Amino acid sequence: MANHRTHETVDSVEALSKAFADVREAQKEFASFTQEQVDKIFLAAASAADKLRIPLAKFAVEETGMGVVEDKVIKNHYAAEYIYNAYKNTKTCGIIEEDSAFGIKKVAEPIGVVAAVIPTTNPTSTAIFKCLLALKTRNGIIISPHPRAKKCTIAAAEAVLKAAVEAGAPEGIISWIDVPSLELTNMVMKESDIILATGGPGMVKAAYSSGKPAIGVGAGNTPAIIDESADILLAVNSIIHSKTFDNGMICASEQSVIVLDKVYDAVKTEFEARGCYFLNEEELEKVRKTIIINGALNAKIVGQKAHTIAKLSGVEVPENAKILIGEVESVDLSEEFAHEKLSPVLAMYKASDFNEALDKADRLIADGGFGHTSSVYLNAITEKEKINVFAERMKTCRILVNTPSSHGGIGDLYNFKLAPSLTLGCGSWGGNSVSENVGVKHLLNIKTVAERRENMLWFRAPQKVYIKKGCLPVALDELKTVMNKKKVFIVTDNFLYSNGYTKPITDKLDEMGISYTAFWDVEPDPTLASAKAGAALMQSFKPDCIIALGGGSAMDAAKIMWVLYEHPEADFMDMAMRFIDIRKRIYTFPKMGEKAYFIAIPTSAGTGSEVTPFAVITDEKTGVKYPLADYELLPNMAIIDADYHMSAPKGLTAASGIDAVTHAVEAYAAMLATDYTDSLALGALKVIFEYLPRAYENGQTDVEAREKMANAATMAGMAFANAFLGVCHSMAHKLGAFHHLPHGVANALLINEVIRFNSSETPVKMGTFSQYDHPHTLARYAEIADHLGLGGTTNEEKTENLIKAIDELKEKVGIKKTIKDYGIDESDFLARLDEMVEQAFDDQCTGANPRYPLMSEIKQMYLNAYYGTNERV
């Protein structure tokens, strides 16, 4: 505990410097207090202030000559009781929030020393309020009182300090300027760590110009609209209650009332019946000259009774007159009644309709109360739309409905979710940094401790996957027996359609009495135009089931048709938007399956599209290939029937088989790989290396090889559907699009370059994903080699053996060694290389690669693959 100190008079720069040093010393100790210690001090300080609410109120009125003692008692009581109640259980010390599952911890720290500028209008209640906030947050505070209210402000601060110290707070945790001056106020703002400024626009501007963080409020010019639907008794008496409270010195109090024409007379009658005085033309002019002098508020009227202000104006009104009301028309600043008046003086306007009332209120706020408070009285049940319009139009941070604004604005009196406060933020409209009622959170620095956590991963596949040679009829039975489907739309290519591949499907549909039609105009690289044409036929036929039959092209085209059929409003470019995390993407894919069930039947063993959420489509206008990805594109059912694979030609067998190899290798190396995808990838590779050469050589005579390859391709598809692919596919997509190579061939020409690239233990940049904590792809490739029994003692040797094994497999199935070998003209390749590189870099697959590629690195890999060189990347 710090040594006992008595407050030394602060009346000079030197004395203030000493006070700052003392408060900082005390705050340094206070910063180590526990929540229990702080809460004990907070309670004691609030209790002491509450007990002195009457003496402090009397002192304030006596010293300032403004306001009403009884109302200041309420303000003092409110500042102590409501602030204590609001924050008594709020954590402000140490760990205030913790979520161990997500690894997030929030730690509250004090800011330091608060400079508190106190207004003359609320000199004791604001001092209590700010001192309590500082104590609850373990901050020190130095108060700069208004010269006109310094004694009562200091008395309030002293009372809080005494109680706090007796409860265990460090001596000197609260201090003040005894002889306030502009010089000392500026100094206290510049030397503090944060400023709580409550006062006029000049003081608030000075706070924001001090170079220190400031929370300041400005002038209010609250308009209150009384709609024709309003409860007039409620509206008028609420406004009187608010406007007369402490003689109108709450900055949120009504300055103008705007009444709709239909109820204007009734409102005026009620005001008069309740003791308000309406000024005639002559009296109005006299009061105008009194309330505003040379464009500024006359300080002599602030917080005075209506009778006193009338007397200053040379107007006789009853001594018990509650409010002086001036019926005026102009909302321009040239109209004195349009200004903030901080006294029981009110402007009253007539509006022909609600829109005109909004216009008037809008102008009054713009000229003098941006950001502060606005008020409306209406039937909140039947006129909700008017509330919405009012809230939309008013540039104020507190929009009060059927509420006296003085009491309503400060919070917790007429709405119990609006935080209690005596410093009301006005947001950027009012030149403030805060747009809400100021509370303890604004005097805290919150540290966020974020522990590393790994992403939630999943494994997703079609609802049903039928496997086994000859399983097609059994699988299709469900369309009738389980789903009761009526109309099927078949998507395939011209070759498959012309050669009878759709006949087993249509025969089964005929047997079940299900009508169907087919679209067979799918190209090898399906275009958006083709997909749109198919979707147009779908819209006409209105199927409840879609069957995609073919290789990746047919299934990809069918997926796009499915989207365009179910959601014709969907924008293709939005669907093609890249994402880092599929669950956080900007574009949300529309919900699929509401019109049609989707079945995929592959006729080649390679793409895996039957079990993936991906589709590749080409924009025929630009030639750009777009890989789309979303789990809404995942087929509902996949039918892996080797009967459809038996007669695949050698070229297709080779290209699709090596495509499946790249799927499995990239899925195993991917940053998002899991135990589930690893098992599928390794299993697929084992099968492919054994059975692809047999399927290639023996064709339809080797049933076992064909069926094994069908299953392996689907397993690899499931692996990359969840682990995603990498830069090999990014590059292959663009190589195929630019130079019209089959997709599987493009992958085959690039995969070994990518393995070498990814296996670097010192990459220029590694991929970004929480699970991927260090470059370990070399070891992953070595694991593949081990699984395939390729030999080698080091990871480097094993990886080289994997590359050799892939080269040997490619040679066995007739894949050429280089891009150049496929007749791609060198000058054309080089001329388009930079564009191809940039598009490959921007491909959706790039982000999942374990080594994040630079464009120069992608370029070198393309060059190596073209020339068959081995230039290090």
Task: For each feature predicted by the language model, list its residue ranges.
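Short loop-to-beta-strand entry elements in the cores of soluble alpha/beta enzymes
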Residues: 27, 137-152, 213-227, 243-281, ...
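ALDH superfamily catalytic-core signature
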Residues: 3, 10-12, 128, 204-332, ...
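Carboxylate- and glycine-rich phosphate/diphosphate-binding segment that chelates Mg2+/Mn2+
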Residues: 265, 273, 611-723
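Rossmann-like NAD(P) dinucleotide-binding subdomain of oxidoreductase/dehydrogenase enzymes
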Residues: 95-234
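Conserved C-terminal structural/oligomerization subdomain of aldehyde/semialdehyde dehydrogenase
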Residues: 5, 31, 315-455
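Glycine/threonine-rich beta-strand-loop-alpha-helix active-site module
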Residues: 156, 529-643
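N-terminal Rossmann-like NAD(P)+-binding subdomain of aldehyde/semialdehyde dehydrogenases
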Residues: 2-105, 133, 273
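Gly/Pro-rich interdomain helix-loop hinge
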Residues: 738-741, 745-828, 871
